């Protein structure tokens, strides 16, 4: 199990996870999964009612398949950055969906692909080692692109996976009903899926249906995270990722795609560097 592999609660607190920025040499921190929860999520979770389910669902797919946008839609908040560039996600990002009857921990992974670089190989290895540590896998395939070699490459990998696999046809709003039906048939022919669900994260269509399907594959379990926690990403990592998202979207030609951001220090917004309070509307970070 890698540092980013999910773990279930053990009851012992651990230090917060570190940022995973390969270009900067940082390694992913411990994350939640079948053995224990570390970092901010190590705090005691509330007691579960009878019949409660909790567990982990991993979103996989080729780069730019809509995994991060879908993660944000299910959580109902921005926990993963998105951009028009493939391979924006560089480490496993966890978002928590809270319901009265279940707690679903989503693991958004980097895109799986045939690697051409060392970074690409590392990202693939990270995804594959995560697959065996979750309760259900969701393969994301966009509706507006024909099923191709990359999808078949991943489908063959997932055929050997232990957890059940749900096929998710993303970006359903981008095609006609006729084209969506054709894509659903093509995806069905790719493998033996536990379920097939078309969704539109942008319009919020079928999001509740997908959540119900994923929850149905979770084991009975008490909550793994406190009720007010939607991610276990440290604050510094979240800030760094938001900066990287803005750079990838707004400075496309001037910056390399293999951009990494490391936050060295976060100043108290109510004080300046000398310790005196900042007056007016100015804030420093």
Name each region found by the language model.
Residues 2-24, 28-136, 141:
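Conserved G1/Walker A P-loop phosphate-binding module
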Residues 77, 96-100, 115, 130-137, ...:
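Conserved, well-folded catalytic cores of nucleic-acid-processing
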Residues 98-103, 122-196, 268-270:
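Conserved C-terminal guanine-recognition region of P-loop GTPase G domains, centered on the G4
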Residues 235-285:
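P-loop NTP-binding site
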Residues 58, 72, 91, 95, ...:
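Solvent-exposed alpha-helical segments within well-ordered globular domains of core cellular machineries
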